Amino acid sequence: MSKSKCSVGLMSSVVAPAKEPNAMGPKEVELILVKEQNGVQLTSSTLTNPRQSPVEAQDRETWGKKIDFLLSVIGFAVDLANVWRFPYLCYKNGGGAFLVPYLLFMVIAGMPLFYMELALGQFNREGAAGVWKICPVLKGVGFTVILISLYVGFFYNVIIAWALHYLFSSFTTELPWIHCNNSWNSPNCSDAHSGDSGGNGPGLNDTFGTTPAAEYFERGVLHLHQSHGIDDLGPPRWQLTACLVLVIVLLYFSLWKGVKTSGKVVWITATMPYVVLTALLLRGVTLPGAIDGIRAYLSVDFYRLCEASVWIDAATQVCFSLGVGFGVLIAFSSYNKFTNNCYRDAIVTTSINSLTSFSSGFVVFSFLGYMAQKHSVPIGDVAKDGPGLIFIIYPEAIATLPLSSAWAVVFFIMLLTLGIDSAMGGMESVITGLIDEFQLLHRHRELFTLFIVLATFLLSLFCVTNGGIYVFTLLDHFAAGTSILFGVLIEAIGVAWFYGVGQFSDDIQQMTGQRPSLYWRLCWKLVSPCFLLFVVVVSIVTFRPPHYGAYIFPDWANALGWVIATSSMAMVPIYAAYKFCSLPGSFREKLAYAIAPEKDRELVDRGEVRQFTLRHWLKV
């Protein structure tokens, strides 16, 4: 007996399909050929449904085009940290040698986790909370990542507002951070760089503490000199508030109609950075000292691989650079067609992310080499990470170029677009996660989106006060550090162990027609959870309180930071306790309903619980 499948349209001349008035979606004809002994072949045919989601009946929006989804994922994953953090870590940790642990962790943990989130969202077609129908007791993980994305929105939008402020300030014949003759400059400001002149007060980059660029950022934009600390914030600055309003308006109109609108916005925001990076690279490599900077970036010191800090930096960079754990990948992939090849998407997008991080290092260090030669200092004196790189050092380098205003406009447009699509992803995670969980919100998406963006705007106002940089630093340090690593760890355990890597692989095969290989199943089951556990433990053991330059945060501020961090992590045990207590029956029955997928409810009713068998936990 042999079986073959073909579409109804192609078989219309051979088989007349039965009509089903209420049938939804395309059908397939299954032909069964039976060869009898007399040589006569008889055929029978039946109509079968093609692969479809368990929730296919729901009227769920999908991406207008496949490229909309890919650009959205790439735009979210490739953010400002690709420009300001990876190149610095590579330089700091042995240059090209750093790529060894980075690529290793990317292959054994980063890609598998990325693939897992895409498949999880696409199969279940719900946001970060709704997907936990696969293990109801762990739905708190969904609320953890939603809350983290909301926290990040409170301060991430401020970075975009800074970039917008710089962009507006660049439309002049002379950039405002070139000289020390402005109203915001202090008597200590000096156009001439001095390698040891930067110890006079707080700053992102002590070496550049008294340059016009540093004073423009800290005194002209932030007005940090008018604050004595986090307990002396002062009023919001109207210029930054206006920029923040523009950012919020842009985010709202990009998100209010769902992926149909955001999928079009990313055509600009996700592609523009690559155009600008290419232009900056072509300009940077022609500058004097650029080769020295690139040589410093790529210099290989394999002895550094013997240091634990190098491996720790590589592990944390992999975790944060891909954007797993924010619920964004789950939200985006939930709008895919059910049969979309999420495996290929995972490979393509993670590869593009890593290549972007690596190539941006050539752009950054060509300019840093130029700055080092210009001021006759070692590259280590100008090689920094964080906001100081893109708002102090890079603007100062651009200011020395011919047509500096034009280059500044180009650079800050890149920062603006890098930030916008990442912020859109974070907001979409919150919106999709909650409207899928609460159907009342689903019917009023536009109003709920307005509520979310207004809430983030109001809380972001604390970050645009005179002392707002202290609030920004506190949130940046606590909101998405250990908490997001914890969330991803529980997520990996929930999918691979409680739901089962075998069942998860069956789901992927149902979608794509291809079962994940043993490599991916081993990574999900063993390697990725162990990797995440290692990173969580290391992040706790190596924790250092936040600081901004010479400013040390008071104890109450650090306590507030831990409240922020633990508030998101607490969603896991709080919801688990609520779910367990709300279920009827004995302890065993409660446990069965809590850890078994909702689709297995009938099996649980009959006492057939996969999770109560040893085979389930050992299966790979």
Swiss-Prot record:
GO terms for biological process: adenohypophysis development; amino acid transport; cognition; dopamine biosynthetic process; dopamine catabolic process; dopamine transport; hyaloid vascular plexus regression; lactation. Chloride binds at residues 317, 321, 357. One of its GO terms (molecular function) is dopamine:sodium symporter activity. InterPro entries: Na/ntran_symport (IPR000175), Na/ntran_symport_dopamine (IPR002436), SNS_sf (IPR037272). Dopamine binds at residues 79, 149, 153, 320, 422-423. The record marks 105 as: Contributes to high-affinity binding to cocaine. The chain crosses the membrane at residues 57-95, 96-127, 128-171, 237-256, 257-287, 307-335, 336-376, 401-442, 443-466, 467-499, 517-542, 554-583. Glycans are attached at residues 181, 188, 205. The keyword Transmembrane helix applies. Keywords: Cell membrane, Cell projection, Disulfide bond, Glycoprotein, Membrane, Metal-binding, Neurotransmitter transport, Sodium, Symport, Transmembrane, Transmembrane helix, Transport. It catalyses: dopamine(out) + chloride(out) + Na(+)(out) = dopamine(in) + chloride(in) + Na(+)(in); (R)-noradrenaline(out) + chloride(out) + Na(+)(out) = (R)-noradrenaline(in) + chloride(in) + Na(+)(in); dopamine(out) + chloride(out) + 2 Na(+)(out) = dopamine(in) + chloride(in) + 2 Na(+)(in). Residues 172-236, 288-306, 377-400, 543-553 are extracellular. It is a multi-pass membrane protein. Residues 1-56, 500-516, 584-620 are cytoplasmic. Na(+) 1 binds at residues 75, 78-79, 418, 421-422. Monomer. Homooligomer; disulfide-linked. Interacts with PRKCABP and TGFB1I1. Interacts (via N-terminus) with SYNGR3 (via N-terminus). Interacts with SLC18A2. Interacts with TOR1A (ATP-bound); TOR1A regulates SLC6A3 subcellular location. Interacts with alpha-synuclein/SNCA. Interacts with SEPTIN4. This protein is the target of psychomotor stimulants such as amphetamines or cocaine. Belongs to the sodium:neurotransmitter symporter (SNF) (TC 2.A.22) family. SLC6A3 subfamily. This is Sodium-dependent dopamine transporter. It comes from Macaca fascicularis. The gene is SLC6A3.
